[in-house]
């Protein structure tokens, strides 16, 4: 993101930065590299390969041609991102590793609090007395590797964050999992919201006026950005906000970068009034002003100088008339890398060598959840989303290559790439029951919008091509031998597959329709999965439900959710009824057990709900609109359980469904060439241990993949 020479556009510098990292990291080779492509789905990759849309000699094609491909990789249930990544890292299922959804409640926390599955204690904790478990029921594979003297690097992998985990909402909570268990030799946490949400600005020429003083013109010339028409400045500041303890006043000016004798404004310049337009060069994470040339179709980064969290954002211009009659600007959300004390040196290394945390694809923009976007066309907002797809995967790739540069001979490098998941959620519009206009329930079947479907198919393809480029760049950094085989053992996996969904399900309305008291029962949802928690005395702080009432409530929840059926023939495809839930699993209970309410089994972990339920494929708790939009053919009901969704793709369903299969590729010195019919994602960790000659942790449930290793 550094503009080392301000005459170079940002996209060129990003490419140069990536090339430099590729060159510098190619001289040494890690032993094992695992790359997780969130949401990559075997059937979609095969379709793109069959259509010759994946470039030969790159990424997926190298791995398939020189190594092993599995036709099916059964992940865990629920097939959610945090759940599956912790399963990959531990080689254990969600019950023992205690991460059962992306968001859930620690039973030690107050009844209204939740924790992210990405930051929850792996393998559980001691409930009474509350504290760290010296013998957790699952450990990440880096625990055994580091004990054996191996070098491990995690680049935004779930669980590798250097966090001291505490119980949310509990005053004076002890550390229930120390940072040491979540820290490796080089640990890069996944980024976080920096304090300013995305928003749009729709301006016209009336919003601009000539510069009041010539000072800024001189600054722009000094910075290498002269204007060949009169510089126009917004009459009032574009925005003011506070991030990381610092207040910012952002102004925007329009310049004409073409020396053609015609007034045609083509570039917007964003700067902080307190900083002015500085000429540079800038040292990362600093960027100076953001210069956005509309014709590039790309955003520009903007570092928030002085912010305590080292945050930054971006500006994207989605529409710009040469006479400024239409000016549409999308300000991306501010983001940063968490400054966790245990890994602060690694965080600063990324900030100063790669840049501040880039903007990942933000669904709030195309769904118009972010303010100020009502005048923007769908295509404008989709263009902003696609820009973020490119931007963020490029950033994650450079983070991975920087990690490789720091530890070129690491024994294990674990890399996470967010695409194609984000795009599939937004654009997997492939089912005739999906409303192409979320506000119009009639836009299904023959009333779907074919142009929108075609655009969305292109965006999904682009996500896979972008992910493939990331894989290819990392493989090329590892290096290929004379036979074209990667010099390291490279695993490319995903956490889950993907399917379209056509109906949103309201957890809140399930409780209301079922007559449940929300002070006693709550529903914590993640995708198509829900944990129903009961506010049990002696378990939750200030719990109110007696053990006897708990048993009654648990039975009522099970009976009610099992009774929910979809009877609308437009959505049941010829069946009279379709159960809304495929899996409904209660926590085992024994009224005489001193650990009543903490019992576990092969599906229910310590912090899972008292009833865990998984929706039938095609239904999803996410996507409920406000106000709710009733489906075509359903009764008009503002509190309906089933409704029209505002996006299209989902995962988290039963992992035995073929479409939920993750991908699995492997190639390298220790990998055979061939095809495997079936692998399991919990087998990846012990297979890596085998390659590195380390005995797996005794909590590992997976086994070495048969037929993979030489």
Positions of predicted regions on the chain:
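A contiguous, mid-domain pocket- or channel-lining segment that forms the substrate-recognition surface
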Residues: 127-379, 392, 396-414, 418-438
